[in-house]
Amino acid sequence: LILLSAEDERRLGAQEHLKISRQFGGAYDLKRLTDYVTGVGRKLAAHAEYPADRFRFTVLDTPIVNAFALPGGYIYVTRGLVALAGNEAELAGVLAHEIGHVTARHSAQRYSRQMLTGLGAGVLGAVTRSRAARDLANLGGTLYLRGYSRDQEFQADTLGIRYLTRAGYDPGAMASFLAKMGANARFQAKLRGGADNTAAY
């Protein structure tokens, strides 16, 4: 069940974008890198089942290795993740996966479930679309970091592989980078002397 319209998603993504930037130290200001990431993202987005011009790619200025997407086509990778990628195909694999989440509207599904929990089915019948977006924004800016279901991750992988292939990248790069992220997460956990708390992309 998705309670948000396409316009609600764009509005919500724009609202949360400002919160994301503040939380992660802002956008990375190395224009050459941000232009490069945007170029790779647009190359992939041209093959997605979603208007390519609605995607917005941002490199966040943090060494944390992570990537995620917001409703409305907002996609984020950290400079730590870009540094970990060994080649363009691995970076493309991450971006393609996040584009898959946007195309399948997984964030909108997650926000809708949260709204159902918070407001109750009876109240939802009287809520307008614009009110829905406003209420969801008030739930806080942490929903985007919560994990997707296994089925959603599988769907994002499937779509991502499709976009990688159509754009001329090696689809195997997605799996190789996932393995690299796992190794990095285990190493960081050992340095901290605790369990691995790294969020999966």
Could you describe each region identified by the protein language model?
Residues 1-201:
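A Zn2+-metalloprotease active-site environment signal
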